């Protein structure tokens, strides 16, 4: 990941910056929404206020027009000068309201028509206790124009409401698109900052996985990202170097220990053989028994040293190259190698290979099968059964080694693959177990990208399962 000049140096700074930048579009959207809401609120208040004023003025003008006509007719009937003054006062008041209402009317012709009719009604003209014919016509024209004014005012008020609704809808659509854009911007920033944080974490995870697989990290690992994660990466590098050093010291110690034990052991074996051959003189039956015990113990010690060396060598070996391995020849070889002890215990072996091949290293797989089958023979019940079977499950091949006998206690199952662990059920035979066989077998299987574990099979006492990658020829 490329480091920017302004890249946050710490994880806290990066997280705070991420929160701020992600919240920024939302804050901008909230601020604009607040501004727009205020503007729409003010506009709605203005529309309501002007609408109320215009509607009341229109109603007042209608009432004034009716009062003018009533005063006009009363004057013609009573010929009272006071009524003439009232009429002129009403006419003046209507004229003032008409001037104020002129900006509301959508058409200036309507205003001019009302103004002309109002001017024509300036003089009172009566005939036979009523307006003369011309005056009556002017009053009727004025009333008709006033009605048109009221209708025009209503149209204007309605158009204002529609305009406000359109603006609200346009603002809503605008904020909808803006919300979508800002959401996408926030999403991009979330993904960007997630990558900035997860990237170094993934690198650390890969380093830990390599450590768990027993591979060295080397000194070529580069770190980027916040200082806390870089510090963790450096500590993991230090841990890798420390583990490599400890591993080398362990291998060296085991080599030296095995070498130092071999020399006195060889002398012990040679002396025991000389005593057993009675080279130094005849032995009594009691002495022969002691010599036999010494010989058996020295052989057990020699086997333990050889297993230690084998375990050490396989731990230090590099990654193996997997190849297509036919299972039938390996199984046949393993069964034949242990046919005598199996026959001595009158044990029967069944072979059922539904999966005929897998990806493995032939010698390592044979070593594992030999160990598991040997355990089945020596730990199994006399006159019991052993079953070697294989099956295909997706891209994996299962190889089961099953025997009848005493089941492994539940409390020991998590420990049987640990080096030097020996369970409560002891091995039957001339050679005592060392506790390294299953540990070596599991390490070998893991080096072949597989797994070895104990499973519970219905009707079976003990079942060890090998899981390996399947080959293209597996059926």
Swiss-Prot record:
- Looking at the UniProt record for this protein, which Gene Ontology cellular component terms does it annotate, in alphabetical order? plasma membrane
Tell me which Gene Ontology terms the entry assigns under biological process: osmosensory signaling via phosphorelay pathway
Give the UniProt keywords, A-Z.
ATP-binding, Cell inner membrane, Cell membrane, Kinase, Membrane, Nucleotide-binding, Phosphoprotein, Transferase, Transmembrane, Transmembrane helix, Two-component regulatory system
Q: List the disulfide bonds.
A: none
Where would I find the Histidine kinase domain in this sequence?
A: 256-472
Any coiled-coil ranges, and where? none
**Segments passing through the bilayer:** 14-34, 174-194
Q: What induces it?
A: Induced by epinephrine during late exponential growth, probably via the QseC sensor.
Q: Post-translation: what modifications?
A: Autophosphorylated.
Q: Which domain of life is it from?
A: Bacteria
What does the record give as the reaction this protein catalyses? ATP + protein L-histidine = ADP + protein N-phospho-L-histidine
Q: Which residues lie on this side of the membrane: Cytoplasmic?
A: 1-13, 195-475
The EC number of this protein is 2.7.13.3
Consequences of knocking out this gene = Mutants can still form pedestals.
Residues annotated with Phosphohistidine modification: 259
Q: How does it sit in the membrane?
A: Multi-pass membrane protein
Compartments reported by the entry: Cell inner membrane
Q: Which GO terms describe its molecular function?
A: ATP binding; phosphorelay response regulator activity; phosphorelay sensor kinase activity; protein kinase activator activity
Q: What does this protein do?
A: Member of the two-component regulatory system QseF/QseE involved in the regulation of virulence and metabolism in EHEC. Required for pedestal formation in host epithelial cells during infection. Autophosphorylates in response to epinephrine, sulfate or phosphate and then probably transfers its phosphate group to QseF.
Record protein name field = Sensor histidine kinase QseE
Q: Which organism is it from?
A: Escherichia coli O157:H7
């Amino acid at each position: 990941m490329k480091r920017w000049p302004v890249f946050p140096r710490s994880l806290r700074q990066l997280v705070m910056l991420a929160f701020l930048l992600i919240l920024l579009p939302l804050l901008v959207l909230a601020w604009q929404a607040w501004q727009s809401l205020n503007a729409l609120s003010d506009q709605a208040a203005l529309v309501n206020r002007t609408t109320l004023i215009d509607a009341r003025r229109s109603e007042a003008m209608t009432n004034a027009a009716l009062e003018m006509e009533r005063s006009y007719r009363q004057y013609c009937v009573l010929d009272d000068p006071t009524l003439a003054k009232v009429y002129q006062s009403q006419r003046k008041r209507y004229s003032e309201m008409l001037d104020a209402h002129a900006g509301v009317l959508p058409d200036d012709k309507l205003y001019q028509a009302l103004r002309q009719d109002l001017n024509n009604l300036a003089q009172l003209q009566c005939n036979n206790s009523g307006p003369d014919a011309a005056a009556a016509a002017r009053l009727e024209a004025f009333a008709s124009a006033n009605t048109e004014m009221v209708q025009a005012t209503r149209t204007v008020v309605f158009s204002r409401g529609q305009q406000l609704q359109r603006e609200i809808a346009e603002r809503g659509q605008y904020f909808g698109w803006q919300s979508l854009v800002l959401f996408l911007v926030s999403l991009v920033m979330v993904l960007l900052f997630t990558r900035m944080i997860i990237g170094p974490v993934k690198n650390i995870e890969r380093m830990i996985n390599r450590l768990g697989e027993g591979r060295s990290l080397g000194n070529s690992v580069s770190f980027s990202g916040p200082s806390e994660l870089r510090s963790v990466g450096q500590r993991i590098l230090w841990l890798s170097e420390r583990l490599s050093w400890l591993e080398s010291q362990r291998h060296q110690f085991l080599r030296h220990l095995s070498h130092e034990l071999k020399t006195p052991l060889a002398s012990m074996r040679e002396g025991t053989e000389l005593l057993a051959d009675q080279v130094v003189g005849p032995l009594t039956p009691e002495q022969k028994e002691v010599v036999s015990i010494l010989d058996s113990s020295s052989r057990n010690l020699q086997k333990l040293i050889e297993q230690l060396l084998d375990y050490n060598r396989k731990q230090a070996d590099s990654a193996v190259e997997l190849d297509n391995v036919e299972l039938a020849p390996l199984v046949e070889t393993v069964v034949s190698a242990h046919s005598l002890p199996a026959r001595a215990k009158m044990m029967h072996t069944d072979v059922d290979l539904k999966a005929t091949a897998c990806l493995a290293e032939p010698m390592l797989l044979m070593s594992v099968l030999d160990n598991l089958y040997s355990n089945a023979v020596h730990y199994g019940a006399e006159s019991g059964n052993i079953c070697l079977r294989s099956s295909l499950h997706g891209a994996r091949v299962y190889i089961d080694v099953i025997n009848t006998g005493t089941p492994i206690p539940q409390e020991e199952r998590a420990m049987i693959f640990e080096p030097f662990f020996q369970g409560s059920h002891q091995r039957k035979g001339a050679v005592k177990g060392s506790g390294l066989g299953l540990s070596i077998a599991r390490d070998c299987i893991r080096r072949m990208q597989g797994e070895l574990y104990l499973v519970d099979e219905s009707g079976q006492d003990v079942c060890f399962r090998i899981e390996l990658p399947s080959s293209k020829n597996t059926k």
